[in-house]
UniProtKB/Swiss-Prot annotation:
NCBIfam families: PRK14451.1. Disulfide bonds: none annotated. Pfam families: Acylphosphatase (PF00708). Belongs to the acylphosphatase family. It catalyses: an acyl phosphate + H2O = a carboxylate + phosphate + H(+). Keywords: Hydrolase. Gene3D superfamilies: 3.30.70.100. This is Acylphosphatase. The active site is at 25, 43.
Amino acid sequence: MTQKEKNETCIHATVSGKVQGVFFRESVRKKAEELQLTGWVKNLSHGDVELVACGERDSIMILTEWLWEGPPQAAVSNVNWEEIVVEDYSDFRVR
């Protein structure tokens, strides 16, 4: 395992609160691209937002902190995330 591989991780996260209809997914995509992360983000039918993000551990930690803020119109009440097996995505997409 290379040093780069040791420093990379993926997370699966669910964000709750007023996170749909407030440009949350697009804001996550922009933040992820800014942090050079790959993965995806999508709305869930019950009102939460789900995402998978992969990249350098420091960038992932910045994203997990940012998820509590989101875009100005959002009102985040909870963020649950866990590390998962590293997956290989070519970019970050809104689903």
